[in-house]
Swiss-Prot record:
Taxon lineage: Bacteria, Bacillati, Chloroflexota, Chloroflexia, Herpetosiphonales
Domain notes for this protein: Has three domains with a flexible linker between the domains II and III and assumes an 'L' shape. Domain III is highly mobile and contacts RuvB.
Domain of life: Bacteria
Native species: Herpetosiphon aurantiacus (strain ATCC 23779 / DSM 785 / 114-95)
Gene transcribed to yield this protein: ruvA
Similarity remark: Belongs to the RuvA family.
GO molecular function, one term: ATP binding
Function: The RuvA-RuvB-RuvC complex processes Holliday junction (HJ) DNA during genetic recombination and DNA repair, while the RuvA-RuvB complex plays an important role in the rescue of blocked DNA replication forks via replication fork reversal (RFR). RuvA specifically binds to HJ cruciform DNA, conferring on it an open structure. The RuvB hexamer acts as an ATP-dependent pump, pulling dsDNA into and through the RuvAB complex. HJ branch migration allows RuvC to scan DNA until it finds its consensus sequence, where it cleaves and resolves the cruciform DNA.
Record-given protein name: Holliday junction branch migration complex subunit RuvA
Region of interest (Flexible linker), ranges: 144-153
């Protein structure tokens, strides 16, 4: 997987940028929110990327943070949502706004996004609501967006151990603010919350 790209901005389009990495121009589709922050042609830019593989093509999608990329990958896991619709969702709102809309079951807001009807918005809420939880976004995520991918992984681990999604989220929300951004250590602390260690 190509996890990130750093290079000189060669071209800025409506929904993509071309970044020159040592003489190779990579076309990277990006949300509009990223286009607004990419800088100008000739500037150096870094994007966190997702390589989408289909049998007939490879496509790179770029994001301003690992958390934004993690949310894109979560959206791709919802049936009926492909990369273009996931990109449209991230163009319409910040990751935090999307998470809040999903946690609040705000079908109206979600269905305003091009490519998302009421049925798809309802499916999105149904499949992802548990990922963000009753408490929606913990304060730790808003101050350190890189924890989104890590906490999503931890929720998956805890639910595979038999805890409910709500219990897993409660354990993660109870982690101290200075908890290290390390999967094993955060898992150990989460299990202590349950009295399992």
């Amino acid at each position: 997987m190509i996890a990130s790209v750093r290079g000189v901005v060669q071209l800025i389009g409506q929904d993509q940028v071309v970044i020159d990495v040592h003489g190779v121009g990579l076309a990277i589709a990006v949300p509009r929110t990223v286009l607004a922050t990419i800088g100008a042609i000739g500037d150096t830019a870094q994007l966190y990327t997702h390589l989408h593989v289909r049998e007939d093509m490879l496509a790179l999608f770029g994001f301003s943070s690992p958390a934004q990329r993690a949310l894109f990958e979560l959206l791709l896991g919802v049936s009926g949502i492909g990369p273009k619709v996931a990109l449209a969702l991230l163009s319409a709102a910040t990751p935090e706004e999307l998470q809040h809309a999903i946690a609040r079951e705000d079908i109206t807001m979600l269905s305003k996004v091009p490519g998302i009807g009421k049925k798809t918005a309802a499916r999105l809420v149904l499949e992802l609501k548990g990922k963000f939880g009753v408490a929606t976004i913990s304060p730790q995520l808003s101050t350190n967006p890189g924890l989104l991918a890590l906490n999503t992984e931890l929720i998956d681990i805890l639910t595979s151990l038999g805890y409910s999604t709500t219990e897993a989220q409660a354990a993660l929300n109870a982690l101290p603010a200075d908890a290290p951004a390390d999967t094993e250590e955060r898992l150990r602390l989460a299990l202590q919350y349950f009295g399992g260690v």
